[in-house]
Amino acid sequence: MDPQPPPPAQGSPPHRGRGRGRGRGRGRGRGRGRGGAGAPRAPLPCPTCGRLFRFPYYLSRHRLSHSGLRPHACPLCPKAFRRPAHLSRHLRGHGPQPPLRCAACPRTFPEPAQLRRHLAQEHAGGEVELAIERVAKETAEPSWGPQDEGSEPPTTAAAGATEEEAVAAWPETWPAGEPSTLAAPTSAAEPRESESEEAEAGAAELRAELALAAGRQEEKQVLLQADWTLLCLRCREAFATKGELKAHPCLRPEGEQEGEGGPPPRPKRHQCSICLKAFARPWSLSRHRLVHSTDRPFVCPDCGLAFRLASYLRQHRRVHGPLSLLAPLPAAGKKDDKASGARNSAKGPEGGEGAECGGASEGGEGQNGGDAAPARPPAGEPRFWCPECGKGFRRRAHLRQHGVTHSGARPFQCVRCQREFKRLADLARHAQVHAGGPAPHPCPRCPRRFSRAYSLLRHQRCHRAELERAAALQALQAQAPTSPPPPPPPLKAEQEEEGLPLPLANIKEEPPSPGTPPQSPPAPPVFLSASCFDSQDHSAFEMEEEEVDSKAHLRGLGGLAS
């Protein structure tokens, strides 16, 4: 029997008085006990080795090393461990674990964390605790993986069967190692058949309760397969691209699918006079008319390309780099056509989604004499509002995409890692993790690569100063030929006539005559500081008479400055 730890010193708080421990209130009451304000916590020594610990939990965990107890045994080999974390880490060495089965649906998961997340997302509400209880009962059965539907768990022959017979009847579900006797079932008072029947009854009850709330829960619709195709789980049809999957009728919202008794489609009263294509909304016709017109009012200031919509121009300007995106969009040119002027005035920055056609805006009727179109908000204002949080959107598709955040459903699942996503775009972006290889968006100025184009644009802000310097240098180089050239230096004859001193580069030394002795190189110049002239003794600077006369002669000729 292990000796009990000594009682804490006087003035130190007991273990239950530590407050929240590692929570937010950890720094408030640290080191303050009931004995006095600011009293330090007394360390707790180990009675066996004398090691000091700050908290009783650390001391009790340390005392397991002296006791030799290993309560967490491995069910596959004779090894045992002191902590459950060590056991879970050891189980990974036996190979992949069999999947865990959900008690409410036939889905399986390789990790307990994924099963808990599935229960919280799919079977949310009051059914989560019941589902966890069913899972705990099923995982407590002999085998870790899901049993066949027709098979029943093994039972002991009699209540008084020996432990060896129970171990022999225990099925071996793992290829590596043999189950230890600690994990084998012993003779229990209640038969195992009653437990399995109770678990099945609870699972059936849970499925019945979840069926009532199936109307507000979205089922899994799309699955990313191993061959990178998108599989529709409703009709089992695979698609190669995301656009083909979105056009699939199974992914349409409720009420818009054919034959489901939803609201009737809006009549298409607005018809194009050129191709006879009809539209249900006037602004859809206005946007369609741009296909037939040659009017391209949005011109790129960098390369001169013209576009029909401002959104097309904004997407094109990414080619010219981040500096082009920082500049404002140029305004559309003024047109004499009345219809185009009405379109440009009502179009707004998005370029056509909220623009009305000229005929519908001038008159009070539609294109073919229908009823007047309802008054629409100004361009850029939200038209669709979320009933849950009141957030506004300009497009109905954005409102549908936002509704997933309130439902909590994740209808898009990756088949490789069982990870779930709210949007199809997130699933397609996640596929790059399994594809491997370099990211598709490299930075042109550094070796970094990014998986998203937006991340690359955000990263290029770091090179903004460098790009601005390069742009300024290019501007200076472009302006250099236009500046007047510097005046040429005056000629030698002009300088001699004006009496100006010639530069040293233009003075040529005459070669010495053959009979003259070689001259010594000129002495280096001597520089005197101002402190030399502050001395009272000027004898060192007295010059001889010949030297004074020569200097006076030069000064008279103008060659020496006075």
UniProtKB/Swiss-Prot annotation:
GO terms for biological process: regulation of transcription by RNA polymerase II. One of its GO terms (molecular function) is DNA-binding transcription factor activity, RNA polymerase II-specific. PROSITE patterns: ZINC_FINGER_C2H2_1, ZINC_FINGER_C2H2_2. It is found in: Nucleus. A zinc finger (C2H2-type) spans 44-66, 72-94, 100-123, 270-292, 298-320, 384-406, 412-434, 441-463. Residues 349-369 have a biased composition (Gly residues). Residues 1-43, 139-203, 327-379, 477-562 are annotated as: Disordered. Its main location: nucleus. Pfam families: zf-C2H2 (PF00096). SUPFAM superfamilies: beta-beta-alpha zinc fingers. The modification Phosphoserine is found at residues 194, 196, 483. The modification Omega-N-methylarginine is found at residue 92. It comes from the Eukaryota. Residues 1-11, 482-491, 512-525 have a biased composition (Pro residues). Residues 15-33 have a biased composition (Basic residues). GO terms for cellular component: nucleus. Keywords: DNA-binding, Metal-binding, Methylation, Nucleus, Phosphoprotein, Repeat, Transcription, Transcription regulation, Zinc, Zinc-finger. Transmembrane segments: none annotated. May be involved in transcriptional regulation. Belongs to the krueppel C2H2-type zinc-finger protein family. PANTHER family: ZINC FINGER PROTEIN, ZINC FINGER PROTEIN 579. This is Zinc finger protein 579. It comes from Homo sapiens (Human).
